Amino acid sequence: MERVYNFSAGPSILPLPVLEKVQKELVNYNGTGMSIMEMSHRSSYFQSIIDEAGSLLRELMNIPDEYEVLFLQGGASLQFSMIPLNVMNTYKKAGYILTGSWSKKAMQEAEKVGEVQVIASSENEKFTTIPRLDGLLGDEKLDYVHITTNNTIEGTKYVDIPHVDKVPLVADMSSNILSERYDVSKFGLIYAGAQKNLGPAGLTIAIIKRDLIGGADRSCPTMLNYETYSKNNSLYNTPPSFSIYVTKLVLEWLKEQGGVSAIEEQNRMKSSLLYNFLDESKLFTSPVDPTYRSLMNIPFTTPSEELNSEFLQKAKERGLVTLKGHRSVGGMRASIYNAMPAEGVQQLVNYMKEFELENR
């Protein structure tokens, strides 16, 4: 069977050249006579892989020297707990901006550790927009302010990153890391599950300013303390070695594409193909405030569940798969991460045009 265009929100599409390289090196990595999956994480071979992955991420995101890059496990969902356990240590209070399901889950975990202040929320608008923050970030008696830069389920993103003077800004970038340029120095901590835009499932990346490491309470479990990973080059215990290796290959691929600025240009072009069609369509609509449209996750729907089901079935027959929207939103969702070629988006738009003509 030929490869399909996979619009899954995660685990998601990986660049074909990366998969082919993995296939080539799978049984015998670099003349070692064994697979990465069999290799000791204490070996010099793996040490060079994790070092290269870290330095590539630093280069691509222009990460300043005062930040650590940590390779973790447990997904972004474990970070919802690790962050308050490590950073909520002066005022025992943090601010959360609610823009979707994931930021809400992050807040709910933080409430188990300390006090949470909801600075702003777009829940009353069903998370179809990003709340305005004018003058809302003045409270300095917070240990950090948490945002989700891109809302995978609802299809929104921040256009401007909130300016926070004296409080560390913490960002969940799981679904748009490396998709557009960000000034890392504006953040105290950035985290992302790898399985959307970085690599395969099993790896979580954290980029943390060094002065935020080491402040966890003594009761914080060893494996939930950033200091454990910082002191041991992310090798305190066995890391997700294969996921780190594939992520390194994805970062090499991204560099070959021209880096983040080039991929951002490509992502803006790809998302415009779909948004331009949706804006003109009489059948398909998108619920998202146009100002805050995501470049990565694009929800859309028809007027009826029957048409949605028919659309999804026929799309699958054409090799356009995993387009079903999240159960909390319904309809359809196209996740068009870095690895999705423009041709895949164009094929989707062509099919949507045909479907609209058939169902006028």
From Swiss-Prot:
Paired cysteines (S-S): none
SUPFAM superfamilies from the UniProt entry: PLP-dependent transferases
UniProt pathway annotation: Amino-acid biosynthesis; L-serine biosynthesis; L-serine from 3-phospho-D-glycerate: step 2/3
GO MF annotation list: O-phospho-L-serine:2-oxoglutarate aminotransferase activity; pyridoxal phosphate binding
Coarse class of the protein's main subcellular location: cytoplasm
Any one GO BP annotation for this protein: L-serine biosynthetic process
Keywords: Amino-acid biosynthesis, Aminotransferase, Cytoplasm, Pyridoxal phosphate, Serine biosynthesis, Transferase
Enzyme Commission code: 2.6.1.52
Recorded catalytic activity of this chain's protein: O-phospho-L-serine + 2-oxoglutarate = 3-phosphooxypyruvate + L-glutamate; 4-(phosphooxy)-L-threonine + 2-oxoglutarate = (R)-3-hydroxy-2-oxo-4-phosphooxybutanoate + L-glutamate
Family matches, as Pfam families: Aminotran_5
Positions that bind L-glutamate: 42
Keyword field contains Cytoplasm: yes
Annotated cofactor note: Binds 1 pyridoxal phosphate per subunit.
Residue list for modification N6-(pyridoxal phosphate)lysine: 196
Tagged with keyword Cytoplasm: yes
UniProt cofactor(s): pyridoxal 5'-phosphate
GO cellular component: cytoplasm
Positions annotated to bind pyridoxal 5'-phosphate: 76-77, 102, 152, 172, 195, 237-238
Binding partners and assembly: Homodimer.
Cited function: Catalyzes the reversible conversion of 3-phosphohydroxypyruvate to phosphoserine and of 3-hydroxy-2-oxo-4-phosphonooxybutanoate to phosphohydroxythreonine.
PANTHER family attached to this UniProt entry: PHOSPHOSERINE AMINOTRANSFERASE
Family designation: Belongs to the class-V pyridoxal-phosphate-dependent aminotransferase family. SerC subfamily.
Name of the protein this chain belongs to: Phosphoserine aminotransferase
Organism: Bacillus cereus (strain ATCC 10987 / NRS 248)
Name of the gene: serC
